[in-house]
Amino acid sequence: FAVFNLTRTHESNMWEQMDGEPIAPDPAVDLEAIEVPPYFPETPKVRQSLARNYANIEYNDRRLGEILGELAEDGLAENTAVFVWTDHGPMPRGKRWPHDSGIRSPLIARWPGGIAPGTVREELVSTIDLAPTVLSLCGVEIPQHIQGQAFLGPRAAPEREYVYAARDRYDEMYDTVRAVRDKRFKYIRHYHPEQPY
C-alpha cells in the first residue's frame, strides 16, 4: 500500500512567485484557447492563472505516468489497484466551495481484472469512500464506525442517492455553507445570506 500526494495543483502553486522567486514555470498553454468559466472575469490575468493551473495538471500527469511506469518495471502493475483523485483547483468557486466546480472532480480507478479499461461510471462517490473501498478490495470486513461506503470489490454497497458537502472555515474567517446533491440537482444552503457571494 502506498499513497503519493502530487500537490502541484494545490492552491499554493497558482501564484507566479512568492517572496520574489518564481514557484511555477511559465505555462506552455495557448492563452487564447482557454475557455474562461462564466463566473470569472475575462481578463489576461485570469487566463494566465488558468493556464498555470493547466500546466500544473500536465506536470502531475507526467509524474503519475512515471509512477505507473515504476509499477510496471517492478512487475506490480497487474496486481495493483490504483486510485487517482484530483484537487479541485485553486481558483474561486473551486477551492473550499460546495459548487460543482469545487466538489465534482475526477476519480480514476485502475483495477486489473476488476474494471475494464475505458469504463465510465456515473455514480456519486466521495473521498470518504476510498478507505472502505480499499478494505473491500483487500477482502477485509469494513468496520461499522468507518464513514463512507465501498464502491468496488466484494463489499461494494448499493449506489448512493446523495452526496453531501460543506464549507466551514476559510483561513481566519468562518463561513457556514451546506450542500446536498443527487444526479440531477444540488441544494446549497448558505447560513450567512448577508455575505455578498
Report residues per predicted region.
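Active-site-proximal cap/lid insertion segments
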Residues: 1-131, 135-145, 188-197
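C-terminal cap/loop subdomain of S1 sulfatases and analogous C-terminal strand-loop tails that border
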Residues: 92, 131, 138-197
